[in-house]
Amino acid sequence: MSLIRTRKKIVSSAIASSLSMIATTAMAQEAVSQLPTIHTKATQEESLKVDQSANSKFVAPLLDTPKSVSVISKQLIEDTKVTTLADALRTVPGITLGAGEGGNPNGDRPFIRGYSSESSMYIDGIRNSTSQNREMFAVEQVEVTKGSASAMGGAGSVGGSINMISKVAKKGDFLEGSVAAGTDNYQRITLDGNKDFGNGIAARVAVLGHQNEKAGQSNGAEYKRVGIAPSITFGLDTPTRATLSYYYLQTDDKPDSGIPYWDSSLGKAQGKPAEVKQGTYYGWKDRDFQKQENHIGTIKLEHDLTDNITITNTAMYAKSKNDYVWTNPDDSKGNVGKGLVWHRLNSAITDSETFTDQLALTGKFDTGFLKHRFNVGAEYSKQKTDKGGYNIIDAKGNVSSTGFYSDCSDLSTNWCTSLNGPTQKPFVDRLQARPDFDATVESTSVYLLDNIEITPKWLLDLGLRWDKFEAEQNFLATSSAAAYTAKNNSDFVTYQAGITFKPTENGSIYTSYATSASPVGLNAGWGDNSETINANNQMIDPEEAQTFEIGTKWDFLDNHLNLTAAIFRTEKQNTRVQIDPTTYANVGESKVDGFELGLNGEITDKWNISAGYTYLDSELTKNGKSCRSGKCTDQSIYNGNQMPNVPKQAATLWTTYKVLPQLTVGAGAVYSDKVYGDVANTKWVPSYVRYDAMARYNVNKNVDLQLNINNLSDKRYFTKAYASHYATEAEGRSAVLAVNFKY
């Protein structure tokens, strides 16, 4: 297979590059070993508190920004040893994970404050929202902006957005990494080396090799990943700088299939996941797979026009592929009531190419007594996507896109398995790739962000953005429908405004208002079906939302500890809903009222903490209809129900304490309330508490040993609730021992 050959080449290149970096850096360390400051930094732990966003659109420090922002710091990533973005986001309360496109559970689909942020994922401030599983090996930190924010990020951003900050070349020499092994065949190696060549030139490379099986699942899901992320920067400490970077990640997985819901025929808790043995696997290993490949190339140019004004241009080209065949443990024919599960096929072949260019002018200036910190810019992006899937052809020549014997009428065909004791049997049919459609999404925008200091105690935050959006999908002819093209062209203005009062230098009290817009076709080609464009919804206006927020932020203990609190309401007022089989209208409504608390930083020089709590009171205030195969069901009977994927209460805690100069221990907990998967509130997963622990021992100034145990109590809980069919069971207890090194 070409993917396997490519992986071998990537691994070989990665190892060669890493060994070269190790040798070079080791010699450099030997040559300058008389400099004690380098050694001190090698073992120093960073704070869990972050004061400034790495995104230039945050023109003021986070303390003075009238918006809720949670930062998953580098230290928190290292403490918890999270390896994927999905795992990292579980450290932020108010975020839940939903099933991906077509019910596929194997792509990042976070919900922030109740609304999907699948289309609001960014890398270094540039949209990167194709369906994929994102890795952490080349990520410095993750910034979660909460509330409507289209003035900053463009279309989408109803409940918030997620921005991953990349590791890029910088000043100084260092080499760090980790070699880890654990339960469930866990093996992981990461290397991160930076070399400062002098004369303003530095290079950096991050390398990954990873594999594991799903914890608590025997002969089930498997995950394999390799990646490399080199970068080089020119002009450090000069007025003109250039950074060139490349990112590559390849995955080869056997995906998990989830646990089917109970149905009413069983006389049990209808809608709750089936009470089968923890770790039960319904996938068809002889058939199922998921292969992803991601390439991202970036050129960033910066020039300081003056000491206070900088112009920046960032161009990014991204190419991604998501190819999978996955088992949906289908319950639609009443099979679960018979003690059976059908191996329904879900599949996709998605190839996407995106070019984005951002031009920004940032800095500060005064107009009379007003002091401005600003970012004004323009953005252009174009994404092309080809999407298809797989058909199944049996020995008789029958063709299906989902499979055969859905009623489990012939168990000899291997299409069904036992609910309580599923077995693996050969897949004797044939898969054949098929094209479905291609899509193009193009957007152009200009924006202005300004934070104005009226007096040292009063700040005004303003933002305005105009977007022009064009989407087109070309559907190929099928046996039941002719080929056709669907288009949507729209433009919209979004804005934000906030007032901050600073009673003291270390505190702020603010109120803010922000809007967002989501046009039809925003996720054309890869997103959830409700967000793609078709003949019936192509003339619909963009959805609109708004967030009102009142909050306060305080730095305590000599600015080492940060406390935040906010109350908010997000309203989505003209949601696209179906009126009849061929008609959509902007008449849907929903809202979320909430409250949240956050605490991050150092309580003492030995005690670090990151904690948060959210309360979300969500409501579907106006629903439309659900139409399938020409038949519609009135959804207005569910008005007043809780929104899917929204726990009423959620909390996270991570804390570490240095009990000895060489020994640090840590503990964490994650709590989530009951979550519904559907608007009818009939499919749901129960609340849970998960506990984690960590111990790190410094062997010497360069090497430490770290043990992480996740899900200490081996709690059976669920991370995703799909609208029908299944829920995703979380991993069982796992342990990982890592050797970390820093030079």
Swiss-Prot record:
InterPro entries: Plug_dom, Plug_dom_sf, TonB-dep_rcpt-like, TonB-dep_rcpt_b-brl, TonB_rcpt_b-brl_sf, TonB_sidphr_rcpt. Its main location: membrane. Disruption phenotype: Deletion decreases sensitivity to siderophore-beta-lactam drug conjugates. GO terms for cellular component: cell outer membrane; pore complex. Disulfide bonds join C408-C416, C627-C632. The keyword Iron applies. It comes from the Bacteria. It is found in: Cell outer membrane. Transmembrane segments: none annotated. Residues 61-167 form the TBDR plug domain. Keywords: Cell outer membrane, Disulfide bond, Ion transport, Iron, Iron transport, Membrane, Porin, Receptor, Signal, TonB box, Transmembrane, Transmembrane beta strand, Transport. It is a multi-pass membrane protein. Residues 172-743 form the TBDR beta-barrel domain. Residues 1-28 form the signal peptide. Belongs to the TonB-dependent receptor family. This is Probable TonB-dependent siderophore receptor PiuA.
